[in-house]
């Protein structure tokens, strides 16, 4: 009966903890389950395909359950929406700086574009440079839409200027073409494989999001040699830009198109090109085309031939001293004539464009915001 007579023990309450000691426990109770750990290798793979800050890449992978494809979709959607909003906010800002970018492909195609931004600081930014180069490569690689009428302009002495305006609205919706850093040995122009097609507009929006400035694709032109080529004439494009890191982009840029025909009516140029020394002739013509483009940029060139136009001597390409050809004091016309005579061919400059960042562009509606 001892159990019945034993006095009941006092109820023991838990000892109070100091507030400082209790906080960690309270935080643990209030904190949700830890998010799954994101592998560093997966973050690196995502950033390689879609360059974003580290934290943004980690967030995208967490939200997509570590699914790389889903994370890419998440980033594209969120980045595009954010960039569109920012583009609308900065669209009214002046774009007086930028670059003229040129892309020459395989000695058969050339493209030139004018991409504008707000400040010279951004114009020298690597993101902006890469964007301008990509747009220029795309312009050179793609054909101008077939319904775009060939214009006739005063700077060409021929019926049609072979250099065509490329509508900026068409370029914006075109896929961005990524090409090798240099032409391949066989002259092929195969685009590099990409994980996901990106339009030029999306590329501009991405650059806008990274630079924070208003970007505009102001103008674009391109030339593509006829394919298949005719036996009687070869067209050779050339390009040069001044004031940039390379001779493919700068504050001033110019492109030209040379026609090369045989001096012997009985011997078409095709037989010369495919005969002994033909490769050397083609390489020499390509080098000369670049030199002529450099001449166009180095002088305030406006027209190829004077014709009946009231222009200064230094503005007429064929009348300028060909200073870019080893400092030659003879006119461009005379040098080209002698160059061709030595090789049994006739050279003509049949197309030309010279652009500068500071040009006043008359047709403002052709400016295209990012």
From Swiss-Prot:
<dbReference type="GO" id="GO:0003746">
    <property type="term" value="F:translation elongation factor activity"/>
</dbReference>
<keyword id="KW-0648">Protein biosynthesis</keyword>
<keyword id="KW-0496">Mitochondrion</keyword>
<feature type="transit peptide" description="Mitochondrion">
    <location>
        <begin position="1"/>
        <end position="29"/>
    </location>
</feature>
<comment type="function">
    <text>Associates with the EF-Tu.GDP complex and induces the exchange of GDP to GTP. It remains bound to the aminoacyl-tRNA.EF-Tu.GTP complex up to the GTP hydrolysis stage on the ribosome.</text>
</comment>
<dbReference type="InterPro" id="IPR036402">
    <property type="entry name" value="EF-Ts_dimer_sf"/>
</dbReference>
<keyword id="KW-0251">Elongation factor</keyword>
<keyword id="KW-0809">Transit peptide</keyword>
<protein>
    <recommendedName>
        <fullName>Elongation factor Ts, mitochondrial</fullName>
    </recommendedName>
</protein>
<dbReference type="InterPro" id="IPR014039">
    <property type="entry name" value="Transl_elong_EFTs/EF1B_dimer"/>
</dbReference>
<dbReference type="InterPro" id="IPR001816">
    <property type="entry name" value="Transl_elong_EFTs/EF1B"/>
</dbReference>
<dbReference type="Pfam" id="PF00889">
    <property type="entry name" value="EF_TS"/>
</dbReference>
<comment type="similarity">
    <text>Belongs to the EF-Ts family.</text>
</comment>
<dbReference type="InterPro" id="IPR009060">
    <property type="entry name" value="UBA-like_sf"/>
</dbReference>
<dbReference type="GO" id="GO:0005739">
    <property type="term" value="C:mitochondrion"/>
</dbReference>
<dbReference type="GO" id="GO:0070125">
    <property type="term" value="P:mitochondrial translational elongation"/>
</dbReference>
């Amino acid at each position: 009966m001892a159990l019945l007579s034993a006095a009941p023990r006092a109820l023991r309450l838990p000892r109070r903890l100091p507030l400082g000691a209790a906080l960690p426990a309270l935080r643990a109770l209030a904190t949700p389950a830890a998010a799954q750990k994101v592998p560093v290798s997966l973050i690196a793979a995502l950033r390689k395909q879609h360059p974003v800050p580290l934290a943004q890449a980690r967030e995208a992978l967490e939200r997509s359950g570590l699914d790389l494809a889903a994370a890419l979709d998440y980033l594209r959607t969120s980045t595009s929406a954010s960039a569109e909003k920012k583009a609308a906010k900065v669209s009214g800002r002046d774009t007086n700086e930028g670059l003229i970018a040129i892309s020459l492909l395989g000695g058969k195609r050339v493209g030139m574009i004018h991409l504008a931004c707000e400040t010279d600081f951004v114009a020298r930014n690597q993101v902006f440079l890469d964007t301008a180069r990509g747009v220029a490569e795309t312009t050179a690689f793609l054909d101008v839409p077939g319904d775009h009428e060939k214009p006739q302009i005063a700077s060409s002495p021929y019926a049609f200027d072979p250099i065509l305006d490329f509508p900026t609205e068409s370029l914006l919706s075109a896929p961005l073409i990524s090409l090798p850093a240099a032409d391949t040995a066989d002259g092929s122009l195969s685009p590099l494989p990409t994980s996901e097609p990106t339009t030029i507009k999306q590329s501009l929006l991405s650059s806008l999001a990274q630079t924070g400035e208003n970007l505009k694709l102001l103008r674009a032109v391109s030339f593509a040699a006829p394919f298949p080529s005719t036996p009687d004439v070869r067209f050779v494009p050339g390009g040069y830009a001044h004031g940039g890191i390379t001779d493919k982009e700068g504050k001033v840029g110019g492109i030209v198109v040379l026609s090369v025909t045989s001096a012997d009516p009985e011997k078409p140029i095709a037989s010369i090109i495919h005969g002994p020394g033909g490769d050397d002739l083609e390489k020499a013509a390509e080098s000369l085309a670049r030199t002529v483009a450099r001449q166009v940029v180095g002088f305030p060139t406006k027209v190829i031939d004077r014709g009946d136009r009231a222009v200064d001597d230094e503005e007429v390409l064929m009348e300028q001293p060909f200073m870019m050809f080893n400092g030659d004091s003879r006119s461009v016309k005379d040098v080209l004539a002698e160059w061709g005579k030595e090789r049994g061919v006739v050279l003509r400059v049949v197309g030309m464009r010279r652009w500068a960042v500071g040009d006043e562009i008359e047709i403002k509606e052709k400016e295209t915001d990012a």
